[in-house]
A protein has these predicted regions:
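Alpha-helical membrane-targeting segments
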Residues: 42, 165-191, 231-277
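Mid/C-terminal beta-alpha module of Rossmann-like enzyme folds, strongest
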Residues: 198-263, 276-316
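Conserved glycine-rich Rossmann-like NAD(P)H-binding loop of the short-chain dehydrogenase/reductase
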Residues: 28-38
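Conserved Rossmann-fold NAD(P)-dependent oxidoreductase catalytic core, especially the SDR/UDP-sugar
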Residues: 29, 81-143, 147-153
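N-terminal Rossmann NAD(P)H-binding glycine-rich loop of SDR-like oxidoreductase domains
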Residues: 2-28
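Substrate-positioning beta->alpha
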Residues: 161-162, 181-203, 210-213
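NAD(P)H-binding glycine-rich loop region in Rossmannoid oxidoreductase-like domains
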Residues: 37-100, 104-107, 119-123
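Flexible, glycine-rich beta-alpha linker
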Residues: 127, 148-167, 220
């Protein structure tokens, strides 16, 4: 039987590293298309010798993208950024990049394309991130009508940039900020469940043309997530309400840092709930039981406790 090839753009990122391992176990030959292949070599041990190959293919480079998808049966686009820097813009990566991948996949005769977007993607949204994701979805649907689109809520897991960031802050600061009072609602989804969902769409032709919104089994306010975090790391910290206006003003200065902890665009995103829409196709429609936050957090946040994994049970 001929080898099945899948190209994963952005495959060295948080979701990508979980997806690549799953695809390798399903006997796919995996091309990991990234900007810097040398930073994706850590993925090779997830498969057999020669099964996982990093290749240089930035989504803004049509020639490199064309080469990366040639001969592939399936393509996954995970390429994304959380803030803009230099040539890396939301429009360039999320919109034009997605269009480039979709057009190249269609021209190469790829059988299945999976576009990973985000809950709240809307080309008329309040934040540029959401607008670029929405524009990307529209471009993909035009170029490759049979593409499956997945929209996760905030994704959590060992390498996440959400719980890890606030847990690290709680080690140093006596207070955690509640932007907008902490009332924004989220439906955190486990990275393993997201990877399973993508793998199903890669493997199952029946998923073509469908849009799925991926969330966990429960909805939380931002404040509830911070309370859950503090219980898990066994620390007491002040939860300080931070008005949207003040947060956006301060984020303007934080954006000047090489790796900004907060941007004005992210503050604007927090003005909208990030939960699965009523009537949307979900993890359940893919045959996946969503994993609860409370099950996974103890497996990686214990290192933020006052005494690490050997912490005494008392709060400090």
């Amino acid at each position: 039987m001929a080898a099945r090839v899948v190209t994963v753009f952005g495959g060295s990122g948080f979701i990508g590293r979980h997806l690549v391992g799953r695809l390798a176990k399903q006997a796919w030959i995996v091309r990991v298309a990234v900007r810097r292949p040398s930073r994706a070599t850590f993925l090779k041990p997830l498969g057999d010798v020669g099964q996982i190959t990093p290749v240089r293919a930035p989504v803004q480079d049509p020639v490199a993208v064309e080469a990366a998808v040639t001969g592939a049966e399936a393509v996954v686009n995970l390429a994304g950024i959380l803030y803009e820097r230099g040539k890396q813009s939301f429009t360039g990566v999320h919109a034009r990049g997605a269009q480039t991948v979709a057009e190249a996949a269609a021209a190469a005769g790829v059988a299945r394309l999976v576009q990973v977007s985000a809950i709240g993607a809307d080309r008329h949204g309040v934040a540029e991130y959401a607008r670029s994701k929405g524009a990307g979805e529209d471009a993909v649907k035009t170029a490759f009508p049979g593409a499956a689109i997945l929209r996760p809520s905030i994704v959590f897991g060992p390498e996440d940039d959400f719980f890890n960031r606030f847990a690290a802050l709680a080690r140093l600061s006596p207070a955690l900020p509640l932007i907008g009072g902490g009332t924004t609602r989220f439906q955190p989804v486990y990275v393993g469940d997201v990877a399973d969902a993508i793998a199903k769409c890669v493997d199952e032709p029946a998923r073509a043309g469908q849009t799925y919104e991926l969330g966990g089994p429960r909805v939380y306010s931002f404040k509830e997530l911070m309370e859950l975090l503090l219980r898990e790391i066994r620390r007491r910290r002040l939860l300080l309400p931070w008005p949207f206006g003040l947060a956006e003003f301060q984020a303007g200065f934080l954006e000047l840092l090489p790796v900004p902890p907060l941007t004005r665009d992210q503050v604007r995103m927090l003005r909208r709930d990030n939960v699965v829409a009523e009537g949307a196709l979900t993890l359940a429609d893919l045959g996946i039981a969503a994993t609860a936050v409370e099950v996974i957090l103890p497996t990686y946040l214990d290192r933020y406790r006052p005494h690490g994994r050997f912490n005494r049970p008392s709060l400090v």
